[in-house]
């Protein structure tokens, strides 16, 4: 297919499925916590707007959760079908970690999800709030175990190799590996930020159409209030995560920075834009700021960072991909910080809900959190190549022995099925968002009437 061998097709297929999948858990994590906050505020204040927003977003959450489960199962199966070498080599560590995720997180979510979605007016208010909170907690626990597994693949420790397979020797070291705390914090906050932007864009759409209801205004205000706190925090977390990556994966940082050579002994500049050239081993058309790279990554005005030429050619990541994916992520992050701070200025002027250009900007920023997450994951995953377990197992050694034709057909099937199934899911979510929170009362009235009629029948 397009002149690609089975190895590259397997990588493309996994990249496609995992990119599809990560969108849903990111929104699920943020919306679950948002729903718990909304229900808690409603119990405390009895403000009907919080109740409207809870019912409005719970429908979207349910669809999102379902698509996340389905896409996650498909992705997990690929470890056995396309990456059997990895499963055979590292399954004694990644297998238990994924099992812990199912036992501690998925069972918790599944157990309380039914009460959360269908228990309104059927169980007590406090019990329902407890169920919502447990679902939110389950999403966080799920994030914990998934990122523990991924982080171990990035910075492996607590193991030994026996007969060509990884054997765990210290589970605490495996779970709390060097990059895990930074990766967990970075991804969790990214999920909250993405959800806040998604919610804010939905509110902006209704405000632009003249819907000035208090529920819509509350939705817009809450999303921007969360963004004011989390967007700058994410920048700080990203900075310390970068320092950790420099310590444990210096080749990745060199590729991100497009930095090739330290032979001149000068401090490393920060290349804002350019075109990394893997063949010529340089970054063409570089627009750079002298010394700033060393200052950011070394906190020094003289000490350079490692260069790509310090590593063998076969162990260098694809610099053009990670160079640009990182800059997309950072650029969107800066726009998020601008959006949050400017919202404070508009709030002070009492024009937050009336500034049409800002409402349009907020609508435009709706998918930016998810795009930034995808760019970030491209950076971290492509940046660790050619390793699947960093420094231990190469990606080419992890792939299953499939033919080119098999992988081509498999990839085409995934493209078609995902486009159809998840296309309908996206359509339903957009349809629900367009209805708005004020339509919930009418829907609930219809549901109550149908329940009464069915009960009489």
Regions found by a protein language model. Name each.
Residues 1-457:
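Polytopic transmembrane helical bundles with strong interfacial aromatic enrichment
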């Amino acid at each position: 297919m397009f002149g690609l061998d089975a190895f590259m097709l397997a990588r493309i297929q996994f990249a496609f499925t995992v990119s599809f999948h990560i969108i849903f858990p990111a929104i699920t994590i943020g919306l679950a916590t948002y729903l718990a906050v909304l229900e808690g505020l409603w119990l405390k204040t009895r403000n009907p707007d919080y109740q409207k927003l809870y019912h409005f977003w719970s429908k979207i959450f349910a669809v999102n959760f379902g698509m996340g489960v389905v896409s996650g199962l498909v992705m997990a199966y690929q470890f056995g079908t396309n990456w059997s070498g990895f499963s055979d080599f590292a399954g004694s560590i990644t297998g238990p970690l994924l099992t812990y995720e199912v036992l501690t997180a998925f069972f918790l979510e599944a157990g309380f999800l039914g009460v959360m979605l269908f228990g309104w007016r059927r169980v007590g208010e406090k019990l329902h709030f407890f169920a919502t909170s447990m679902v939110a907690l389950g999403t966080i626990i799920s994030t914990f175990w998934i990122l523990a597994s991924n982080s171990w693949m990035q910075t492996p420790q607590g193991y030994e190799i026996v007969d060509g397979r990884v054997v765990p020797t210290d589970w605490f070291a495996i779970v709390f590996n060097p990059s895990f705390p930074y990766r967990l914090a970075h991804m969790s906050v990214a999920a909250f930020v993405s959800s806040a932007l998604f919610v804010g864009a939905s509110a902006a759409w209704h405000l632009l159409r003249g819907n000035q209801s208090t529920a819509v205004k509350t939705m817009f205000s809450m999303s921007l209030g969360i963004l004011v706190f989390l967007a700058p925090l994410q920048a700080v977390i990203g900075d310390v995560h970068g320092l950790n990556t420099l310590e444990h994966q210096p080749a990745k940082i060199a590729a991100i920075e497009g930095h090739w050579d330290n032979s001149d002994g000068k401090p490393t500049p920060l290349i804002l834009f350019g075109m990394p050239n893997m063949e010529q081993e340089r970054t063409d058309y570089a627009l750079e700021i002298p010394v700033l790279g060393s200052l950011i990554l070394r906190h020094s005005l003289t000490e350079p960072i490692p260069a790509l030429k310090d590593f063998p050619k076969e162990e260098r990541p694809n610099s053009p991909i990670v160079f640009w994916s990182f800059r997309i992520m950072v650029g969107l992050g800066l726009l998020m910080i601008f959006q949050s701070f400017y919202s404070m200025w508009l709030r002070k002027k009492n024009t937050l809900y009336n500034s049409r250009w800002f409402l349009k900007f907020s609508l435009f920023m709706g998918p930016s959190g998810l795009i930034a997450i995808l760019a970030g994951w491209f950076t971290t995953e492509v940046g660790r190549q050619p390793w699947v377990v960093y420094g231990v197992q190469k990606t080419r050694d992890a792939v299953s022995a499939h033919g080119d034709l098999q992988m081509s057909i498999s990839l085409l099937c995934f493209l078609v099925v995902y486009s159809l199934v998840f296309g309908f899911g996206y359509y339903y979510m957009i349809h629900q968002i367009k209805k708005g929170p004020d339509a919930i009362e009418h829907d609930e009235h219809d549901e109550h009437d149908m329940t009464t009629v069915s009960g009489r029948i």
